[in-house]
Amino acid sequence: MKRKTIDIITLGCSKNLVDSEQLMRQLEEAGYDVTHDSEKPTGEIAVINTCGFIGDAKEESINMILEFAQEKEEGNLEKLFVMGCLSERYLKELAIEIPQVDKFYGKFNWKGLLQDLGKAYHEELHIERTLTTPKHYAYLKISEGCDRKCSYCAIPIITGRHVSRPIEEILDEVRYLVSNGVKEFQVIAQELTYYGVDLYKKQMLPELIERISEIPGVEWIRLHYAYPAHFPEELFRVMRERDNVCKYMDIALQHISDNMLQRMRRHVTKKETYRLIEQFRKEVPGIHLRTTLMVGHPGETEGDFEELKEFVRKVRFDRMGAFTYSEEEGTYAAANYEDSIPQELKQARLDELMAIQQGISTELSASKVGQKMKVIIDRIEGEYYIGRTEFDSPEVDPEVLIRCEGDNLMIGNFYQVQVIDSDEFDLFGEII
C-alpha cells in the first residue's frame, strides 16, 4: 500500500517551527512521508501551523489557509488541517469562515490531530524531532507561555501562563540532538529569564545553560528573547566563563522612555535599562546585543520618540529590529488606550529609527575588517559559501560570505576566517 504524504507548512516564529518538527516526527512514526513548507500541495494531506501574533502574521496565515483551501476545492488535496496560534485564538470563527478546512486544532492539540488520522501519539518520542534546519543547528525550546502582561502583547492570551520544561528533559533532548549531528543550539522561549520560577521557585536559566554547555559535542549556545526586568545576573558569569556559550544576547527592550515603559507595563525603567546594558558590556567583554524596539504605541509623543532615537545612537546595538504597534484584541492596550497615532506616522518613525541603525550596522561591520573569526558554514549559494560567526543567529542576523576558490569546505564545520570586506549587512572573508 502506498504511503501517504503530509505537507507541513510552518508560519511565524522559531517556537512554532519546533512544534512542527515534533509533529513531523510523530507523523513519520505513524507511517507517513512528510514534507515541509511546500508552496503547493505535494501530498494528499496538508497541515498549516499558523501564527496569530500581530496583524501581518494573521493575514499571512489566513492567506495561506485560503490558498490550500482552494487547492482542496480543485481536487489537489484530500484533507486540510490547521493548528497553531491563529487557530488557538480564533478556532470557532475560522471554522465558520473557511469550511474547506477539515478541522482546526488548538496550538498544543497534536494528539487530537493524530487521533483524527487514526494514529497514536507516541509518548516515548516526545524529545525527538525531524529537523527542518540544516542538521548542524537546532532550536531548543525551554518553556511555553508567558506570565508577563505587557500592554500590547497577545501571547499570554494565546499560549497561557509560563510553563518551564524540566531541566533533565531538556538535557535529554540536547543529547539526542547532538547524537544526530547538532552542534549549535538556539535556546528559545517567549521569556527566557523567567525559566524555572514556576517549576523550581527560582530563576534557573544560568544553571540550565551551564549544564547544557557541559554536554560533549555542544559547540555553540545562543540565547534568544530575554526580558530586562529581574535579569539573572549569575548568567553573566556563565557567559563569560563558558567558551561554548556565545557572547550574544537577544533581549527585547521595546522602548527607553519612562513614560512609554510604564504605559507598556514593562516593569523596568530607563535608568535600569541603561544599567543592564552597561553590566552586559562590563561583565561579558565582546558581547553582541540584539534588541527589538516598538514605535507608535498609544501615548508615544515626539519627545518619547526622540528619547528612543538618542538611545539607539548612544547604545549602538550590534543587531536591532523594530516594528510598529498593532492593536490586538484582548490586550490591556486595546482595552485602555486609543490607537490614535496614524499608521503613516508610525511607519515614518519606524523608517527613521531603522535608518539610524543602518548607519550603525554599517560602521560596526566595517570595524570587523581584518579580524580573524570562527565561522560555521551553513550552505553554498552560487559562488559563495555562506557562514556565520558566534555573533550571528540564523535567519535574522548578518552572514559571512567566503568565495568558493579552491577551498573544499564542509557544511556544518567550523573554520578560521579572516574578514577582508564588509557591507551594510554582511562580512566577506577568506579561509586562513
From Swiss-Prot:
Which ranges carry the Radical SAM core domain?
A: 132-363
Q: Does the keyword Metal-binding apply?
A: yes
Q: Does the keyword Aminoacyl-tRNA synthetase apply?
A: no
The reaction(s) this protein catalyses? L-aspartate(89)-[ribosomal protein uS12]-hydrogen + (sulfur carrier)-SH + AH2 + 2 S-adenosyl-L-methionine = 3-methylsulfanyl-L-aspartate(89)-[ribosomal protein uS12]-hydrogen + (sulfur carrier)-H + 5'-deoxyadenosine + L-methionine + A + S-adenosyl-L-homocysteine + 2 H(+)
Which sites bind [4Fe-4S] cluster 1? C13, C51, C85
Q: Which residues bind [4Fe-4S] cluster 2?
A: C146, C150, C153
A GO cellular component term found in this entry reads: cytosol
User: What is the top-level taxon of the source organism?
Assistant: Bacteria
Question: Which HAMAP family does the entry link to?
Answer: MTTase_RimO (MF_01865)
Which PANTHER family does this UniProt record tie to the protein? RIBOSOMAL PROTEIN S12 METHYLTHIOTRANSFERASE RIMO, RIBOSOMAL PROTEIN US12 METHYLTHIOTRANSFERASE RIMO
Name under which the protein is recorded: Ribosomal protein uS12 methylthiotransferase RimO
* Organism of this sequence: Bacteroides fragilis (strain ATCC 25285 / DSM 2151 / CCUG 4856 / JCM 11019 / LMG 10263 / NCTC 9343 / Onslow / VPI 2553 / EN-2)
Upper lineage: Bacteria, Pseudomonadati, Bacteroidota, Bacteroidia, Bacteroidales
